[in-house]
Amino acid sequence: FFIKDKKPDQKKKIIFINTEWCNTCRVMYRTTFSDTAVSSLLSKHFELVNFNPETNDKLYFQDKEFDNIHSKELPFHQLVYALSRNGLLFPQVIFMDEKNTVVDAIPFYLNPNVFKNIVRFYGEDIYKTKNWETFIKEQETK
């Protein structure tokens, strides 16, 4: 996904920012992303991209080049700072629309039940017509 001259493919993206040393990241990957209902919703609405912010690869996003400069002040890949609204919190899930615009960035572990609702909220474009609180209240009454 983060390669040079990559054309948008008109599919929404979920960027899962995680590191090898993050236990919570591994648990979320093992429990949340492997949940059958979550997996079904993801494949229907999104392309899932795993992103380790400690990579040394040169990456490209929105026609810009990003590196991991390994400085004391910026110990992670520059791209994680460009994508995240929440700073360096792991795990973190970035939701993007079809034009690769960041719609939301949600940090920390999300269990399958919560994540299913979030995936529906963004995957089905509900966020464009309702706020999160209204959407959740409607889900609770079903």
Describe each PLM feature range.
Residues 1-13, 42:
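A short beta-strand-turn-helix
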Residues 8-26, 48:
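Short active-site neighborhood of thiol/selenol oxidoreductases, capturing the structured segment around
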Residues 19-24, 32, 53-58, 100-101:
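Solvent-exposed loop/turn segments at secondary-structure junctions
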Residues 25-43:
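Typically the conserved alpha-helix immediately C-terminal to a functionally engaged Cys/Sec
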Residues 27-30, 54-59, 82-88, 123:
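Chalcogenol-based redox active-site neighborhoods
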Residues 38-74:
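Thiol-based oxidoreductase modules, predominantly thioredoxin-like and allied folds used
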Residues 48, 79-82, 88-106:
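A short, hydrophobic beta-strand/beta-hairpin element that forms part of a small beta-sheet core
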Residues 102-142:
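Thiol-/selenol-based redox modules, centered on thioredoxin-like
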